Structure formats: structure tokens, C-alpha cells
């Protein structure tokens, strides 16, 4: 390729030299003819000769300029062909907004402060130090590198990478080893005296035994039951509501639904009734604390409580009706009495139990 380019350049140079040689004797002859004294009487030949001389001078000047440009291009780009050089000369200059621009490279060190750079350099140095110490020779691959356990909870990682804990009898195991970032580090031995371990066991047992009696803050359902019972009993005491304990005969024959629904929350403002009301609240709080987690939350416990309340109330009404019918023929005063269905003393849980 380079040889063909050189041949083309030599051919163009030889053509230019021959053209210059052919034009030079013609110009010399014309100049000699022009310099000879003419005694011609015609004055019209002088302006024609002067115009020919001017044209010849212009052509010679243009040829000289082209030769100089070609020589400069050959000196600057000796391996570039002449045709490509002429094409580049003929291309118009692009405007300033269409010229391609280069992005200025901005390094991380030019933006950040020297303190941050020093911390990054120290970290990189530390990582290099750890990798050089931890990485074995490339010629002899270690068996640990061949086994890749990607799962974090696999049996291998649990067995080989967990820290050994102290035994239950108070004796401590020898210092364990664990691997972190391919570096084996020695774990300092942990000495737990037997006294601390026994204290922890006693505290756990106490917390389990006292958890049932620790009802503060009160559970959610117990709070609402206390508020409803206090509200209903206060309105009944002030004679705003006329409530009484529900009797099955009135429920069946007179449709006394209001007393059947509100009588479980009703109690009298006497000392025995208030003591029974407190005992019922304690029972409900203990059951809610122990059963709410087993059932699936407070909402499920409320649903279960409503179902039990309705079913037990219906069962008690049916049993009371049968008992009053059975005993009413012997004791007529029991036909429309509420002796078998006393109030639940402020809580519907007594209907269930």
C-alpha cells in the first residue's frame, strides 16, 4: 500500500515537472518576441501583446502556488495521497456549533477534599493488605476456595462459622475460631460465672409465673367491658334506664330482648356486687391475655367472644324456660320469675362460665 502511494506521488511530480518544462520555453519565446523591437506601424498590436504577457504571468503564479502547496502537503503528510489532500482543501469549514466537542475528564480526586481522599487511600491500603495476607498462592488453590457455599443458612456455614457458646453447667469452652472475610481471627474466651447463669434462669421462671398476673396495661377487650358495665350500671342507678335481670319467660313470651342483652353488664352499687364485678374483670383479663395470641389477635378474640355470648345466652334461656315450666306446676311463683337468671354482675363472661 505504501509503495503504491509513493508511485502515485512520483507520477504526479513527474507530470508537474514536464508541464512546467513545456510551458517555460513557450514563455521564453514569447518574452523574446515581446522584447524584440518592432517597427510596425500598427498601434493595435501593443495592447494585445501586453494582455498575453499578463495572462502568462498569472498562470505561472498560480502554478507556483499549487506546487508549493503540494510540496508542503508532501512534507507534512508523506504517506497521504495527493487526491485526499485536495479533497480536504475543498471541504468547507464547519461552523463553530457543529464542530465535535470533547468532554473534560473530571477525576474523583479533583472534587473531594484531601481528608476524604486520605481515608479512602487508607481503606484501599487496608483491603490490599488483607487480600495479600489472606489470598494463597495462585499455583496451589486451597480446598476452601474450591467449595463455594452460597447459602448463608447452610449446614456448612452453621457448623464452621458460628461462635461457640458457653455450656449450661457454667464451664466455658476453649476459645473458638471464626472466619470473616477469609481471615481467621481468634475469639477471646468469654467467662460467665455460674452465679449469673442461675440468676438468669430464676428471672425467666419468675417472668413466666408472674406474666399471668401482670395485667397492666389492661387488655383491649377488658377495658371496653369495664367502660360499658360502668356506663350501663350508672344509668340504671340514676333511673335513666329501667333494666332488670332477664327471665326466660319474659324473653320468650314478651320478647324482652333489651334486658337479655344488657343484663350481663349490669351490677348493683353494693359491696358484694362490686367485689364480684372485680373478680369477673380479672377472669376476663387473664383469659384475654392468654387466649388472644393463641386465637390470632384481638379481633379474632372479639369475634370468638361474641359467638360464645350469643350461644350461651340462648342456651341459658332455653334451660331456664324448661326449668320454669317443669317447676312452675309445683310452685306457680316460678312461672314468671327471674330467680334462675340472676344478673351476671357486670360482665358477660359469667354467662359463658
From Swiss-Prot:
Compositionally biased tracts (Low complexity): 59-95, 133-145
Organism of provenance: Mucor circinelloides f. lusitanicus (Mucor racemosus var. lusitanicus)
UniProt function note: May be involved in transcriptional activation.
Cell compartments where the protein resides: Nucleus
MF terms (GO), sorted A to Z: DNA binding; DNA-binding transcription factor activity
GO biological process: regulation of DNA-templated transcription
Chain intervals for the UniProt region annotation (Disordered): 11-96, 129-174
Top-rank lineage group of the source organism: Eukaryota
Subcellular location, principal: nucleus
Compositional bias ranges of the Polar residues kind: 11-26, 36-58, 165-174
Keyword Membrane part of the UniProt annotation: no
GO cellular component: nucleus
Name listed for the protein in its UniProt record: Putative transcription factor MTF1
